[in-house]
């Protein structure tokens, strides 16, 4: 079937009978990822302004080619690769359909990345300024090749949210070499587990993978990592790793930077002994505020998910950088009180003198520099008014 995304027209597989996503019997196309791709296009446009020398883009798991075609339409010199020859043929057809130049290659992404430079099947000058990893499941099997061979930017999607968030803990430990915990802030847990693993992977190549934009949306995690090949910068970024100590009784949490955990024997708030440790996690900023603002400026009217993309980026830009968020509904359930509107809840925290913002992780999530006890005393129980 033919579709339009952004400014390009594409041929994609028709949906199977009864499917709510455009998934054919062979080549994969997911229309629910249009939001992801809209933000990707805006990020690529913003990055062109940030680093004009970044010209080449690898769509490492191209499938129908939609991501690569949209990147080509934004001015990048695109290479689309996939292990499925039918996918590569469809990607080539979609490039031609839009009168766009680009190369297609039936190959494994790791092989293409490791053969960049003199050994590249694309030519001795081939090197990728931007590498986009959008696999089904975890991106970790492709991370080494990407960080060892990309020049400027690595864009990563992870859809294995259950291991990332701690719901499938052993799988998360095996894949990400981190202990994840399934808490009420599980979307952010997943993002910080992923960033921890990616930053540690890049550091093995004396490279800092700096998050300049990240978001968690619709059962996937997405991050954009700018590369700095100074070993000292990689060391600085590793110092943003650490641990979160979470009380399962009162929901208090505290964090500690460093490579060695020092978990408390009991909760300093309720004195309970059900304190669990998560980590090593990335505890630093998930985005660069100025870059996020520029990405938002490149969300344009032809994008199908313009309203949601702008809303997500606005929240990501403005949310506090504290490492974990709270959920008002979960707190109110714990306190046996009714929830109130989020704007009113945030305003009550501001009135009490605390910093507080809503976050993009959910409609009832917020970040604040107040403790659990301070949040409870600063906000009202509507049943007692």
Swiss-Prot record:
Residues noted as binding Zn(2+) in the record, renumbered to the chain: 247, 250, 267, 270
Single GO biological process annotation from the record: tRNA N2-guanine methylation
PROSITE patterns: SAM_MT_TRM1
UniProt entry tagged with the keyword DNA repair: no
Taxonomy, superkingdom: Archaea
Catalytic reaction equation(s): guanosine(26) in tRNA + 2 S-adenosyl-L-methionine = N(2)-dimethylguanosine(26) in tRNA + 2 S-adenosyl-L-homocysteine + 2 H(+)
InterPro entries, per database record: SAM-dependent_MTases_sf, Trm1, TRM1_arc_bac, tRNA_met_Trm1_C
EC number: 2.1.1.216
GO MF annotation terms: tRNA (guanine(26)-N2)-dimethyltransferase activity; tRNA binding
CDD domains, sorted: AdoMet_MTases
Span of domain Trm1 methyltransferase: 1-379
Sites where the protein binds S-adenosyl-L-methionine: 37, 67, 82, 108-109
Keywords tagged on the record: Metal-binding, Methyltransferase, RNA-binding, S-adenosyl-L-methionine, Transferase, tRNA processing, tRNA-binding, Zinc
Known function: Dimethylates a single guanine residue at position 26 of a number of tRNAs using S-adenosyl-L-methionine as donor of the methyl groups.
Homology family: Belongs to the class I-like SAM-binding methyltransferase superfamily. Trm1 family.
Name recorded for this polypeptide: tRNA (guanine(26)-N(2))-dimethyltransferase
Protein source organism: Haloquadratum walsbyi (strain DSM 16790 / HBSQ001)
């Amino acid at each position: 079937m033919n579709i339009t995304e952004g400014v390009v027209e594409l041929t994609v597989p028709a949906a199977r009978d009864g499917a709510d996503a455009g998934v054919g019997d062979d080549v994969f196309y997911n229309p629910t990822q249009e939001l992801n791709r809209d933000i990707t296009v805006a990020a690529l446009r913003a990055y062109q302004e940030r680093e004009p020398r970044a010209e080449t883009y690898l769509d490492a798991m191209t499938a129908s080619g939609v991501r690569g075609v949209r990147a080509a339409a934004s001015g990048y010199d695109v290479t689309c690769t996939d292990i499925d020859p039918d996918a590569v043929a469809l990607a080539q057809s979609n490039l031609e359909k839009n009168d766009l130049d680009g190369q297609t290659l039936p190959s494994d992404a790791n092989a293409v990345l490791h053969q960049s430079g003199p050994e590249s099947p694309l030519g001795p000058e081939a090197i990728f300024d931007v590498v986009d990893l959008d696999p089904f499941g975890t991106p970790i099997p492709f991370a080494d090749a990407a960080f060892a061979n990309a020049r400027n930017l690595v864009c990563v999607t992870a859809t294995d949210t259950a291991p990332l968030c701690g719901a499938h803990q052993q799988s998360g430990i095996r894949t990400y070499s981190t202990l994840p915990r399934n808490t009420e802030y599980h979307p952010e847990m997943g993002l910080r587990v992923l960033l921890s693993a990616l930053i540690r992977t890049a550091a093995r190549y004396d490279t800092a993978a700096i998050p300049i934009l990240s978001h968690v949306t619709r059962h996937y995690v997405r991050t954009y990592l700018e590369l700095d090949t100074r070993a000292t910068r990689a060391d600085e970024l590793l110092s943003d790793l650490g641990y979160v100590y979470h009380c399962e009784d009162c929901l208090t949490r505290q964090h500690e930077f460093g490579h060695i955990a020092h978990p408390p024997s009991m909760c300093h708030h309720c004195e309970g002994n059900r304190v669990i440790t998560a980590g090593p996690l990335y505890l630093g900023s998930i985005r660069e505020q100025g870059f996020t603002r520029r990405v938002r400026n490149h969300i344009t009217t032809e994008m199908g998910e313009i309203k949601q993309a702008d809303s997500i980026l606005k929240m990501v830009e403005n949310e506090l950088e504290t490492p974990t968020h709270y959920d008002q509904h979960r707190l109110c359930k714990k306190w046996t009180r009714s929830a109130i509107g989020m704007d009113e809840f945030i305003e009550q925290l501001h009135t009490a003198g605390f910093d507080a913002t809503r976050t993009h992780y959910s409609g009832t999530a917020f970040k604040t520099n107040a403790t659990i006890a301070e949040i409870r005393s600063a906000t009202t129980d509507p049943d007692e008014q």
